[in-house]
Amino acid sequence: MFTTQEITTTHRHYSYVEQLMHSAFPENERRDDAQQRKLTDAQGKFRCALIQTQYKEPAGVITYWKFADFTYIEHFAIHPDHRSQGHGTQVLAALLKEWRHPIVLEAEIPALVGDLAYRRIRFYKRLGFRICRMPYWQPPYRYGDGWLPMKLLMLGNEPPRRIVDEIHWEVYGVKNSRLMKR
């Protein structure tokens, strides 16, 4: 049995969260540590949750944004020691039951990244997510980085453009993202 616990940077396992984020996500798919810590401690719409075993040992992390009418999963990672055993499915399925719909997340395009991205998308599809038809670009986390072509996945109906605009503004600080040069 795995559980989640919302944490701040003062939690004794926060360094574990940072290390897992570094190993699970390339630099251009996560913000720098100082920005991440600031968001984690702000306790606004952003949440950082430690995934724990039944013995309270750290096993993963999920970061997400709770908006008025949807939830955006920004990062989800299970430690390699706990992967391929159904633990990620168990954790995410439990969260999906308690969160309001729609739920949105981004995933790499398999043709650009390879087999891992393909397996990741299959994982989300098994949980009921659908790939959205609209083209999607993830804004850069850092000045000077480029926009990343991604797939937008949704549990619920196809997201209106307003949801994408809200994610771009609240998460990435980009207003009028449709006008931005990619």
Segments from the language model and where they lie:
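Active-site rim helix/loop that mediates acceptor-substrate recognition in acyltransferases
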Residues: S23-T53
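Short hydrophobic/aromatic beta-strand or adjacent loop that forms the aromatic wall/cage
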Residues: F46, W147-L152
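Conserved beta-strand in the GNAT
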Residues: C48-L50, K56-W65, F70-A77
